[in-house]
Amino acid sequence: MSALRPPARGGLGLSRLGVRLAGSRRFQLIAERVPFLRRIGRREGEELFDIVAGFVHSQVLYALVELRVLHLVAEGPQTVQALAAATGLAPERMQLLLQGGAALKLLTRRRDGQFDLAVRGAAFLAVPGLEAMVGHHHVLYRDLADPVAFLKGETEPELARFWPYVFGAGGATDPEVTAKYSRLMTESQGLVAEDALRLVDLMGVRRLMDVGGGTGAFLAAVGRAYPLMELMLFDLPVVAEAAPQRLTEAGLAGRFTVHGGSFRDDPLPLGADAISLVRVLFDHSDETVKLLLHRVREALPAGGRVIVAEAMSGGARPHRETDTYMAFYTAAMRTGRVRSAAEIAELLTGQGFSEIKIFPGLRPYVASAVTAVRPSDAP
C-alpha cells in the first residue's frame, strides 16, 4: 500500500489557503464579525448541516411516501388529527412528520394549523417513477447502514437481488421480482426518454433497436416522436414478454418486433441502423460493457449509430446527484458503476467506434448522452 503524501512545503495556493482558513476556529469567530464573511460563513454552515441532516431528510420523505400523506393532502388541506387517524399514527407523531415535511417544502403549514400540499410536493407526485424509487429505498438504506463495511466490500447488498437482470438471464427468473423491476423501470423511464430525445436527434434513422428496452417505455416515446421509424426491442425474455402489449397500446402495432435474449450469451439481432442503450451501461462492469459494445458494433451496419443515455458522473467535476446517489446506488447493485461521458467515450473508442459526440444532460441526474458511429472500415 502506498504511503500518503507528506504535507507540501513552501507557500500555500489560494485553494489550500481557503481550506486552512475555513478549518481555523479563530478565523470562523473573526468572520462572524465581518458582514460579507458572515454571510459566506452562514451559507456554508447551512449547506454543511444539510449534508449532516441528509439521512433524516430522506427518511422524512420515505415516511411521507409510505403513509401516502402527499396524496391525502393533494385534494385540499387536512388537520393533524385527520391525517393521524388516516395513517394510524399518534397525533403527536403525525405532527412531527408534518413539520418535517413542511420544513422540506413538500408541505405547507397554514395559519389554522392544517397542512396542505406545497408546490414541491405536487412536483414530486408528478414526476414519473420518483415515488416508486423512494418506495424501495429501504433496501438501499439497509445496504448503506455500515458505509465503511460497504466500501470495503464486506457486506452482501440486498439491492442486487432487487434488480435481477444484472446477473444475466439466469438472474431474472422470479416472475414477482421481475414484475416489480419492470414496473419501476417503466414508471421511471419516461423522464429519461424525454431528456434523451431532447438531447439526441434521431432524424434519418430507419430502424432503431433498444437493447435492454424492458417493456418498451423508451421505444414508445421514440415511436410517438418519429412516426415513420421502425422499432426493435431486445431484452431478457422474462422482461421483454410484456413489451408487445405496451407497444401495441401505444399505437405502434405493425411497427415493432420484440427479441428475447441475453447479450452476454447471444449476438444481437441484425437489421437496425441505430441502437440505443438507455440506462444500461451503469448496471454493468467495464468488462461486461466492453462485451455489450462489441455486440452492438457487430449488429450495426457501416455508418450505424449507437446512442448511450443515462445518468453520468461529472468526472473531473463531480456532480452532486450522480457522484453521490447514483454512484452509491450502482455500487450496491455490485455489478456496475456510474461513468463519466469521457469514460463512456473511451469505451466506445476501444470497441472501434468513431465520431463520438457528448451531449451534457439538461438534468444530469436524469440523463446525459453519448453517441458514436460504426466506421465503414470497422472489422
Swiss-Prot record:
It comes from the Bacteria. One of its GO terms (biological process) is chlorophyll biosynthetic process. Pathway: Carotenoid biosynthesis; spheroidene biosynthesis. It is an enzyme of class 2 (transferase). Its EC number is 2.1.1.210. Keywords: Carotenoid biosynthesis, Chlorophyll biosynthesis, Methyltransferase, Photosynthesis, S-adenosyl-L-methionine, Transferase. S-adenosyl-L-methionine binds at D235, R279. PROSITE patterns: SAM_OMT_II (PS51683). The keyword Transferase applies. CDD domains: AdoMet_MTases. The keyword Transferase applies. It catalyses: demethylspheroidene + S-adenosyl-L-methionine = spheroidene + S-adenosyl-L-homocysteine + H(+). GO terms for molecular function: hydroxyneurosporene-O-methyltransferase activity; O-methyltransferase activity; protein dimerization activity. Belongs to the class I-like SAM-binding methyltransferase superfamily. Cation-independent O-methyltransferase family. Methyltransferase that mediates the O-methylation of 1-hydroxy carotenoids. Converts hydroxyneurosporene to methoxyneurosporene or demethylspheroidene to spheroidene. Also able to produce spirilloxanthin. This is Demethylspheroidene O-methyltransferase. It comes from Cereibacter sphaeroides (strain ATCC 17023 / DSM 158 / JCM 6121 / CCUG 31486 / LMG 2827 / NBRC 12203 / NCIMB 8253 / ATH 2.4.1.) (Rhodobacter sphaeroides).
